[in-house]
A protein has these predicted regions:
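Acidic, His- and aromatic-enriched active-site or binding-groove loops in soluble protein domains
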Residues: 35-51
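Flexible loop/turn segments at secondary-structure boundaries
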Residues: 23-26, 47, 75
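Short, surface-exposed basic-aromatic patches at helix termini and helix-loop junctions that form
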Residues: 8, 27-37, 53-59
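Long, compositionally biased stretches enriched for glycine and/or charged residues
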Residues: 53-183
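Rossmann-fold NAD(P)-binding glycine/threonine-rich loop
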Residues: 1-32
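A structural signal for short, well-ordered beta-strand segments and their strand-loop junctions
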Residues: 15-19, 39-41, 68
Length: 183
């Protein structure tokens, strides 16, 4: 419905879709509406920050410079330098290998990519496990445990989001007020 409103009110706009299911929604908009649409993944914007935090390198966050390239949902962090121009990848590779060897965590698939491909992928380990046939295999269910892949992550997240929306709806209906904090 909002696409039809946009066709009427702002037909020359460019719609930037950051919502999931991103590919399906973007494809629908491109096929069945006249609105120019691009689908984008939010993972690119937080990729290097989350990587440095996961590896205990928070002191490198400020002033960092990065180069990311690739297609949507499969971008790669090709370069990451600190504020002084030092390449952070040698230390990232060392810490990622150590972390994967010594503890279970939520980024094991992407750290395995670093081990074999040399670079960090922008998309989550859960999505990478879905996209790449090496991690979720019916003949090797132990891979799911080995790489700590939460097969129920997205359904669980949806359940929590729906609960949040229901609470928000109840709050709005109760007092008629909507609050918003600038992010």
């Amino acid at each position: 419905e909002f696409a039809r409103d946009m066709e009427e009110v702002c037909p020359n706009t460019l719609f930037l879709n950051y919502t999931n299911p991103m590919a399906m929604l973007t494809g629908y908009m491109q096929r069945y509406t006249k609105i120019r649409t691009v689908g984008l993944c939010h993972s690119v914007q937080v990729c290097s920050e989350k990587l440095l935090e996961k590896l205990g390198m928070e002191d490198k966050l400020e002033g960092r410079r990065e180069l990311i390239a690739g297609i949507n949902h499969m971008g790669w962090l090709l370069e990451l330098h600190d504020k002084d121009g030092n390449d952070l990848y040698p230390e990232i590779r060392r810490r990622a290998a150590e972390k994967n060897a010594t503890e279970k965590h939520d980024d094991m698939v992407r750290f395995e990519y670093i081990k074999h491909l040399g670079y960090y992928c922008t998309e989550s380990s859960e999505h990478n496990a879905e996209y790449n046939p090496l991690f979720i295999k019916s003949r090797y269910p132990e891979m799911i445990e080995k790489y700590n892949i939460p097969l129920d992550e997205y359904p669980r997240r949806c359940v929590e989001q729906i609960k949040g929306w229901e609470k928000e709806r109840e709050d709005i209906l109760k007092d008629g007020k909507v609050t918003h904090e600038r992010s």
